[in-house]
Regions:
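Residues that form generic nucleotide/phosphate-binding pockets
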Residues: 11, 69, 76-78, 140
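A short catalytic or substrate-binding loop motif that flags glycine-/basic-rich loops and adjacent residues
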Residues: 21-23, 46-47
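Short, well-ordered secondary-structure micro-motifs within conserved domains or adaptor modules
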Residues: 24-32
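Short, solvent-exposed coil/turn segments at beta-strand boundaries
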Residues: 25, 75-76
């Protein structure tokens, strides 16, 4: 296991999204127009709005792992490089990400993070049920 810090241009390519181009599932999307620093992942092949930069791995990093690496590194980068409500596309080239170059470690990390996110979603759904019950109880008692 060897953790490396590299410039994004060494491990990925990026471009401003082209509204007419279909991008592959798993690419990372960085919102650069009217942004609050959103980093998303494309869930299925499709078109992407031009307010995003599309980041694709050059092969050293698995797409899901690249997404999590960018998402982790992005907040301080965003606060340093944003200009008003926007982020200059050219500044994305200054982003540094930390990653493990062992693909098996990347796969394990992805499995563990996805399991945690699945559990988080289940808890959020359970909390929503309790909130709905609470709302119903207030309606019954105070109406």
């Amino acid at each position: 296991m060897v953790m490396r810090t590299r410039n994004i241009t060494e491990v990925a390519q990026f471009e401003r999204a082209n509204k007419r181009k279909i991008y592959r599932k798993g690419v990372t999307l960085i919102q650069v127009s009217a942004t609050k620093g959103d980093v998303l992942q494309l869930e299925e092949d499709g078109l992407v709005e031009s307010k995003y930069v599309v980041v694709e791995s050059k092969g050293q990093i698995l797409p899901d792992y690249l997404f999590f690496a960018i998402k982790h590194a992005f907040p301080p980068f965003f606060h340093k490089w944003r200009t008003g409500l926007n982020l200059q596309v050219s500044n994305i080239a200054k982003l540094e990400i930390c990653f493990d170059d062992d693909v098996e470690v990347q796969k394990q990390f992805i499995r563990e993070i996805k399991a945690i996110l699945k559990l988080k979603k289940a808890y959020e759904e359970e909390i929503k049920v309790y909130e709905d019950v609470k709302k119903d109880m207030f309606t019954i008692f105070f109406n």
